[in-house]
Structure formats: structure tokens, C-alpha cells
Swiss-Prot record:
Assigned EC number: 5.4.99.25
PANTHER family, per database record: PSEUDOURIDYLATE SYNTHASE TRUB1 (PTHR13767:SF2), TRNA-PSEUDOURIDINE SYNTHASE (PTHR13767)
Gene name of the record: truB
Its biological purpose: Responsible for synthesis of pseudouridine from uracil-55 in the psi GC loop of transfer RNAs.
Name the record gives this protein: tRNA pseudouridine synthase B
This protein's record includes keyword Transferase: no
Species whose genome carries this gene: Jannaschia sp. (strain CCS1)
Gene Ontology BP, a term: tRNA pseudouridine synthesis
GO molecular function, one term: tRNA pseudouridine(55) synthase activity
């Protein structure tokens, strides 16, 4: 029997402007097929109905996803005031309604409570695990559960538009684990009018901006052609939050073999997590100690 082709060794980031109606995993699988890549992943799940920035990692770029966990993410979204739903978005069954509509001043006054280090309860329809089962599976089966509040850092929450009395547009910048649907739900409760997300768009993740993203249709149109390579962003972009240390050829060779390698002087302290580069190409991520980088993750680039 002929051996199945496992794909090509392609490494880099593809910044996809995710369309509504697809899961993040489905987008990753499509991109992987288009590039015929061996390995693929993504940095941060978007709900199926959400659009916007979905950074897709190919090959060695998948090793950098873990170092993006502290990256901030930005979202714009519209809240429908006066209605709560089972899913906290427009797809869910309506639970409660209210004729109350807050003023612009009341909305602005409520926002500071959602900024800083806060506690947030995930939506019932979320990927949070409860006794080994996904919350959304329990919810779809008609079950209800009390989900524990989680720590969340929120950089900012601000009004960017008020189309009419029933709607308000917001921008939300947060750390890992934030749920926009929970913000809409909780803001509606604080304002005494209920609320849910009408639409949601992610505009940036860490160093990745939606202005640099391409539509999935563009990726599919170029599938299995050399023109796709022009869409690849460097692997090292995901390491922007870590100090970069340059290495010599000899140091790079040691690091690639999993051994501590000498690095050139840089803005780093003993024990800091940093990444080593040779001519701008990532070699390894590790801890800096006395002129050497002790590798924790090595790149085959």
C-alpha cells in the first residue's frame, strides 16, 4: 500500500479574517489543506458566528502559540439591549425582555466596573469543562450548571457607537480567557435591561492586526500554488513579548542540539525567558543564564 502523504514542512503564520459560520478548527483545517502543511494550529478560538483575526500557525510556528498566552486581544461588538438569550448571543432562545433602555451616560458609568482584574463567569454555552464534559454539551442537552467565575484582566472597555436606543457598540481589550458574550450579559444586568451580543469581530491579537489579515476565500483561491507563500508571516512575530538575543553560528548549532548556547549581550536579566535568533530566524526559546540561553523549545528552521 502506498504511504499516505503527510504534508510539507511549511512554517509561518497565516493571518485569516475569519468569516462567520465556521468554527476556528474548520478554518485551520482549510488553511492546512491549502498549504498542504504537516502541522497547523491557531492562537485563540473564535465563536462560529464571530469574524475577524484568527492567527493560523503552520509547522514550527505552532511551537510559539504557548508564548502568546499573555498577549492582549481586541474585539468590537454590538450589544442588543433589552433581551437576554440562553446563549448570550443572537442565536439563542430568548429568556427575558425589558422595556428599560439606559442612557449614554448610564452606559459609560457602568463600564469601569469591567476594567482591570475582574472575575468573569463564562457563558453556559462555552468550551469550559464541567466534570470532564464541555459546558455547551451539557447546555445543549437541556442541563444547567453553575460555572465558577474566572480571573480575567481587562485592559479597556469603551463605547465606540450608539446606533439607537436598542443597541450599543463597544471595544473590548482583554487578556487570555475573556468572553465577550459574558460582558454583554453582565453589562445588561448591571444596567437593569438585559443584553446579548448581536455581532462580534476580533481586530487584533498581540502583534497580529486585522489590517494584515486575508480572507479565507483568498487563501482557498490560491490553494496548492506557490503564490500562497506570499501570505506567510514570520514565525518570530509571535515572540514579540520576549526579549530577542542574537547568536553566532556556533551558538545556534549548540542550541539546535538542545544544549545551552552562547548569546550576544542584550537587554535581558539572569533567568529571563528569551528567544535566540540567527540572522532574524528563531533558533530557540529558553532561560538566559550567564551569557548562555538554556533552551526549552528548539525550532527546526
Amino acid at each position: 500500500m502506498a504511504r499516505r502523504n503527510k504534508g510539507r514542512d511549511i512554517s509561518g503564520w497565516v493571518l485569516v479574517d475569519k468569516p462567520a459560520g465556521l468554527t476556528s478548527t474548520a478554518v485551520v483545517n482549510k488553511v492546512r489543506w491549502c498549504f498542504d502543511a504537516k502541522k497547523a494550529g491557531h492562537a485563540g478560538t473564535l465563536d462560529p458566528d464571530a469574524t475577524g483575526m484568527l492567527p493560523v500557525a503552520l509547522g514550527e510556528a505552532t511551537k510559539t502559540i504557548a508564548y502568546m498566552s499573555d498577549d492582549l486581544k481586541a474585539y468590537t461588538f454590538r450589544v442588543r439591549l433589552g433581551v437576554s438569550t440562553k446563549t448570550d448571543d443572537a442565536e439563542g432562545e430568548v429568556l427575558e425582555t425589558s422595556d428599560t433602555r439606559p442612557t449614554d451616560t448610564e452606559i459609560e458609568a457602568a463600564l469601569p466596573a469591567f476594567v482591570g482584574d475582574i472575575q468573569q463567569v463564562p457563558p453556559q454555552f462555552s468550551a469550559v469543562k464541567v466534570d470532564g464534559e464541555r459546558a455547551y454539551d451539557i447546555a445543549r442537552g437541556g442541563g444547567e450548571m453553575e460555572l465558577a467565575a474566572r480571573d480575567l484582566y481587562v485592559e479597556s472597555l469603551s463605547v465606540i457607537g450608539r446606533p439607537d436606543a436598542d443597541h450599543v457598540d463597544l471595544e473590548f481589550v482583554c487578556g487570555s480567557g475573556g468572553y465577550v458574550r459574558s460582558i454583554a450579559r453582565d453589562l445588561g444586568q448591571v444596567l437593569g435591561c438585559f443584553g446579548h451580543v448581536l455581532w462580534l469581530r476580533r481586530t487584533w491579537v498581540g502583534a497580529f492586526d486585522i489590517e494584515d489579515a486575508v480572507g479565507l476565500d483568498r487563501v482557498e483561491a490560491l490553494a496548492r500554488t506557490d503564490a500562497l507563500y506570499a501570505l506567510l508571516q514570520p514565525v518570530g512575530l509571535a515572540l514579540h513579548a520576549l526579549p530577542e538575543l542574537r547568536v553566532t553560528d556556533a551558538g545556534a548549532a549548540r542550541l539546535r542540539n538542545g544544549n545551552p548556547g552562547g548569546v550576544l549581550p542584550g537587554n535581558v536579566e539572569y533567568g529571563d525567558l528569551a528567544w535566540a535568533s540567527l540572522n532574524g530566524t528563531p533558533v530557540a526559546v529558553g532561560r538566559y543564564r550567564s551569557g548562555e540561553l538554556h533552551p526549552e523549545r528548539v525550532f527546526n528552521l
